[in-house]
């Protein structure tokens, strides 16, 4: 009992000395090494850990919330990377369209529907002459485009040396009969 009372009185003395020491060093509010042994006192321990514990809990809560927030952006990043892949595909498609930028301006050609690319995209049905369409759509370096055979431009710009009866004929029935000479519907300018 006496030891407990002595410890309490010593703790009070230390508190008084530290309060005087703290008032004298008001500019430096850092606790001195003498104040560190005071922390085990029963009155000071509930005061100090309670303010410290609440920020720690809030910091723990914020850190526990931060991984939750970080977990949410991670899928968004993946989604954006997926989205980045699609713009890359668009970017890959863009240079092809840029290659298609400079267009050939050919002279006026008479339309002969026998050379119309296919029945599904018959420009005559659309009310447009296919030779005019290809004057606008066919790029200069289309022959150099990878994956496409070298088309014979005469298939596109064939003069109307045929009889006018050929105009009465319908376009070829299927894309396989495409007049572009590339051999397949996927390599056709209108069927890619």
From Swiss-Prot:
A GO cellular-component term linked to this record: sperm flagellum
Start-end of Low complexity biased regions: 19-59
Pfam family, one: SPATA3
UniProt entry tagged with the keyword Secreted: no
Region Disordered, residue ranges: 1-65, 161-184
InterPro entries, sorted: SPATA3
Keywords: Cell projection, Cilium, Flagellum
Ranges annotated as biased composition (Basic residues): 1-15
Location of this chain's protein in the cell: Cell projection, Cilium, Flagellum
UniProt xrefs under PANTHER family: SPERMATOGENESIS-ASSOCIATED PROTEIN 3 (PTHR22234:SF0), TESTIS SPERMATOCYTE APOPTOSIS-RELATED GENE 1 PROTEIN (PTHR22234)
The name this protein goes by in its record: Spermatogenesis-associated protein 3
Protein's organism: Homo sapiens (Human)
